[in-house]
From Swiss-Prot:
Its EC number is 3.2.1.52. Belongs to the glycosyl hydrolase 3 family. NagZ subfamily. Keywords: Cell cycle, Cell division, Cell shape, Cell wall biogenesis/degradation, Cytoplasm, Glycosidase, Hydrolase, Peptidoglycan synthesis. It comes from the Bacteria. It comes from Xanthomonas oryzae pv. oryzae (strain MAFF 311018). Plays a role in peptidoglycan recycling by cleaving the terminal beta-1,4-linked N-acetylglucosamine (GlcNAc) from peptide-linked peptidoglycan fragments, giving rise to free GlcNAc, anhydro-N-acetylmuramic acid and anhydro-N-acetylmuramic acid-linked peptides. This is Beta-hexosaminidase. The active site is at H176 (proton donor/acceptor), D247 (nucleophile). It is found in: Cytoplasm. One of its GO terms (cellular component) is cytoplasm. It holds the Pfam family Glyco_hydro_3. GO terms for biological process: carbohydrate metabolic process; cell division; cell wall organization; peptidoglycan biosynthetic process; peptidoglycan turnover; regulation of cell shape. GO terms for molecular function: beta-N-acetylhexosaminidase activity. Its main location: cytoplasm.
């Protein structure tokens, strides 16, 4: 199955045709797709109307610098702000993270979007792409926040996606623009980077997004192209039974599998349920690549939201004062 990107704030005729394809599981929305809150509601409805089956609509609404919907939405704190508070006030920090998850999920669902790919459970150890998206550099602290965040997302009716498996936070390279390799053995990863993923899976996380990072002491290919990582470790050893997403095949670190078709097949062959094709110019070739493949069409049904909440009153029960420990404006709508 493919999650595709679309070009703008309205669907084109070609994009409506793409949504008719059996392999299209849904759409990933970006800043380019956002004009206003009401426009996102209309776009989400148009996507569902164009598809002959239930589809998944997703976004990255993590908070901080990775927040695709801004005007009319709460300005959410980066996850690192909660980790920074934890040493002095752990219970308040966890309460803030739970409120952050509930508020984010409620606003996203009220816009007709099923899920935000969240939470980031990578360790905050200097990666250029992760940065303040991570809760902490301490595996146990990240694990504690992961449990709280997953539970809060579920309480707001949103599925939880752990990313980026098996851990993107320690390598320095940004896989959007460069290849990345982590030389540590599996035992070191199990003692550190995998700890939050174990916690998230135990908390009932619904999905995992793979990293485009190579761990050569474990497998020779990037994790998202690796049966060893997906089938043997994530599913076999760690017991994960949910949906496995690739990261975007338009990222530079994905190019090791060759062209567009090669990347799509490599992810599916490795055990990914869903391949992210975020760049519209790659969609047609990706659809051609999956012609004739057996696809896991049932995998995503559990991720589709439980029905959008109305925007009026969506904050009921949410203590917005906990959306950030540092700045009150993060808890109010912009």
């Amino acid at each position: 199955m493919l999650l595709i990107g679309v070009a703008g704030t309205e669907l084109s005729a070609q994009e409506r045709d793409w949504l008719q394809h059996d392999a299209v599981a849904g759409v990933v929305l970006f800043k380019r797709n956002f004009g206003s809150r009401s426009q996102v509601v209309e776009l989400s409805a148009a996507i569902r109307a164009a598809a002959p089956r239930p589809v998944l609509i997703c976004v990255d609404q993590e908070g901080g610098r990775v927040q695709r919907f801004r005007e009319g939405f709460s300005a959410l704190a980066p996850l690192q702000s909660f980790g920074a508070q934890y040493a002095q006030a752990p219970e308040a920090a966890l309460a803030a993270a739970r409120a952050h998850a509930q508020l984010m999920a409620s606003e996203v669902r009220a816009s007709g979007v099923d899920l935000s790919f969240a939470p980031v459970v990578d360790l905050g150890r200097g990666n250029r792409a992760i940065g303040d998206r991570a809760f902490s550099d301490d595996p146990q602290i990240v694990a504690t926040f992961t449990r709280a965040y997953v539970q809060a997302l579920h309480g707001a009716g949103m599925a939880a996606t752990l990313k980026h498996f098996p851990g993107h936070g320690t390598v320095l390279e940004d896989t959007h623009v460069d290849h990345a390799s982590d030389p540590r053995p599996l035992e070191a990863l199990q003692a550190e980077d995998l700890v939050p993923f174990v916690a998230g899976i135990e908390a009932g996380a619904d999905a995992v997004m793979m990293a485009h990072v190579v761990y050569p002491q474990v497998a020779p290919e990037p994790a998202g192209y690796s049966q060893r990582w997906i089938e043997q470790i994530l599913r076999g050893q760690m017991g994960f039974r949910g949906v496995v997403f690739s990261d975007d095949i338009g990222m530079a670190a994905s190019f090791s599998a060759g062209g567009v078709a090669g990347r799509v097949h490599a992810h599916l062959d490795a055990g990914c349920d869903v391949v992210l094709v975020c760049h519209p110019e790659l969609v047609a070739e990706s659809l051609q690549a999956v012609q004739g493949r057996r696809l896991n069409t049932a995998a995503l049904i559990g991720l589709i939201g439980r029905g959008a909440l109305g925007w009026d009153g969506l904050l009921a029960g949410t203590d917005v004062s906990f959306t950030t420990p540092h700045s009150a404006h993060f808890g109010t709508t912009a």
